[in-house]
């Protein structure tokens, strides 16, 4: 709600006499240390392909399934609500398809203050969306030039490319490239759009190798290996999702095996031995845990959960 904005509060001459004074509080838990990798940023901008009027709203096609947000030129009167609803597909009648989002709202709402300078734009700061299509409502006379699509991903070099004479293969590679960059969000997540967006280990057990052909993912996977290690239980069990926002400690082999496989990839592709050295105690502890609880006298592991799903 732009009507509640504080104005130029970042400037030295801002009158903050009505602010509450700062208070001393307890330090947060956790370990204070330098960030291991760059953060997310806007790495590319796209122009919308089309905007079609549909009743009292508009449907915008960005031309590409991506992760990021839409920046728009602010229009309207004070109190007007501009609403952007994001989706990856359209229904047969041209409406946006949102069933795959489950209970994720995937919506940005901006309330016009009436004080915005001419030509001012707005985009969200604390959320990203996975989308190609956008349903726009509350926006007067929407035109493509009023909107800019901003692609958001972890800041890292794009180091590889591929092209051949087969158009289908080229498109498969292009789809993979966009899928990977859309899921690099401080860690490799499983999707950028629905109500999940979780760093599942198994999805990247082998995926990390192919990803490194196109992205310099050295720092990110080194950081994620630490996340996995720090999510390990005292008994050696490694979760299926790390950081363990979802409490999935199912004691299988294929998903936790991602930790040694990441370390192997970082050594093989980048010549970096440190992840192996740093994570070896955790890997050894996990192997000992599996051997103690789930290995028969014939060296057969009797426990698993997901099988070859997503691997």
Briefly describe each language-model feature range.
Residues 163, 212, 244-251, 267-277:
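The substrate-binding groove and active-site-proximal loops of carbohydrate-active enzymes
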Residues 178-182, 213-234, 289-296:
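Glycine-rich, acidic and aromatic/proline-enriched surface loops and short helix-turn segments
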Residues 207, 242-245, 250-258, 295, ...:
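Carbohydrate-active catalytic/glycan-binding domains of CAZyme proteins
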Residues 280-283, 287:
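C-terminal PAP-associated
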Residues 261, 291, 300-302:
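Structural recognition of the beta-strand scaffold that forms the well-ordered cores
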Residues 195-205, 216, 250-261, 278:
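Aromatic- and histidine-enriched alpha-helix N-cap/loop-to-helix transition segments
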């Amino acid at each position: 709600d732009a009507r509640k904005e504080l104005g130029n509060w970042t400037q030295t001459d801002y009158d903050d006499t009505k602010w509450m004074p700062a208070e001393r509080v307890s330090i947060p838990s956790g370990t204070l240390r330098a960030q291991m990798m760059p953060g997310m940023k806007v790495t590319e901008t796209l122009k919308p392909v089309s905007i079609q009027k549909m009743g009292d709203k508009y449907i915008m096609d960005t031309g590409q399934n991506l992760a990021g947000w839409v920046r728009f030129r602010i229009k309207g009167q004070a109190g007007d609500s501009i609403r952007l609803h994001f989706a990856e597909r359209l229904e047969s009648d041209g409406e946006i398809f949102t069933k795959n989002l489950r209970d994720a709202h995937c919506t940005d709402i901006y309330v016009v203050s009436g004080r915005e300078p001419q030509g001012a734009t707005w985009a969200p700061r604390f959320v990203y969306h996975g989308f190609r299509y956008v349903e726009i409502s509350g926006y007067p006379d929407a035109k493509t030039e009023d909107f800019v699509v901003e692609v958001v991903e972890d800041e890292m070099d794009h180091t590889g490319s591929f092209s051949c004479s087969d158009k289908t293969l080229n498109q498969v590679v292009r789809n993979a490239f966009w899928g990977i960059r859309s899921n690099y969000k401080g860690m490799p997540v499983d999707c950028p759009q629905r109500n999940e967006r979780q760093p599942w280990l198994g999805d990247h057990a082998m995926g990390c190798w192919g990803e490194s052909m196109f992205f310099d993912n050295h720092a990110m996977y080194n950081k994620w290996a630490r996340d996995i290690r720090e999510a390990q239980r005292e008994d050696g069990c490694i979760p299926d999702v790390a950081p363990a926002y979802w409490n999935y400690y199912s004691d299988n082999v294929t998903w936790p095996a991602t930790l040694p496989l990441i370390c192997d990839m970082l050594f093989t592709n980048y010549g970096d031995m440190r992840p192996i050295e740093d994570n070896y105690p955790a890997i050894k502890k996990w192997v000992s845990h599996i051997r103690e609880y789930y290995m028969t006298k014939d060296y057969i592991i009797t426990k698993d959960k997901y099988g070859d799903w997503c691997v």
